[in-house]
């Protein structure tokens, strides 16, 4: 048997080992600032590669979307089941000025609402705000037992559900089309639209657990720096925003 060099064996590296480079040495951190609509404006931090040559770090940050729990923005665990999307529209030094980009429910909250013996009502509508943002708004509601009801189930007739759905769409169109995006955000936090739907549909069907479960941004107008700076307040350095008051007391809803 011929004795020779086994080519399959790995060769030894010549010279010294390469020095390990810290990947974070080429990156820089930026502070994310929420609009003054929310009570806590310091969302967190994000990083990006430093500006080099013709490549500007600010260009890579604009349009970046962050998903934040509303409980962190409002400082209250009552909003822990809702998630807010914030989009970076402008970079000022080390601060990223964001704007509202959408709203959603956590999946565990949605699953906890669906129960036996009741009817589910869902409605959605595409509507334009007063400042030309095109949104698709989704609402959800459930039937509940009437006072002194003996029957176990609370299923509703299809005709009644259609009436309720029509009323929900009317209210969502009215409440969204007459306000700006910032004013709409102030309505969504205390769930004003859900309470308005509950009040208006009492004559048709008694409802419970009425929520605007999702808001999706479809189209936005041409970027206006002045309106964004006004949304963040002068200088955009304040850590606290304006507290949104619901004007309502929590009502314990009747369960099935």
UniProtKB/Swiss-Prot annotation:
InterPro entries: Ribosomal_eS1, Ribosomal_eS1_CS, Ribosomal_eS1_euk. One of its GO terms (cellular component) is cytosolic small ribosomal subunit. It is found in: Cytoplasm. The modification N-acetylalanine is found at residue 2. Its main location: cytoplasm. The keyword Iron-sulfur does not apply. SMART domains: Ribosomal_S3Ae (SM01397). It comes from the Eukaryota. Keywords: Acetylation, Cytoplasm, Ribonucleoprotein, Ribosomal protein. One of its GO terms (biological process) is translation. One of its GO terms (molecular function) is structural constituent of ribosome. Component of the small ribosomal subunit. Mature ribosomes consist of a small (40S) and a large (60S) subunit. The 40S subunit contains about 33 different proteins and 1 molecule of RNA (18S). The 60S subunit contains about 49 different proteins and 3 molecules of RNA (25S, 5.8S and 5S). Belongs to the eukaryotic ribosomal protein eS1 family. This is Small ribosomal subunit protein eS1A. It comes from Clavispora lusitaniae (strain ATCC 42720).
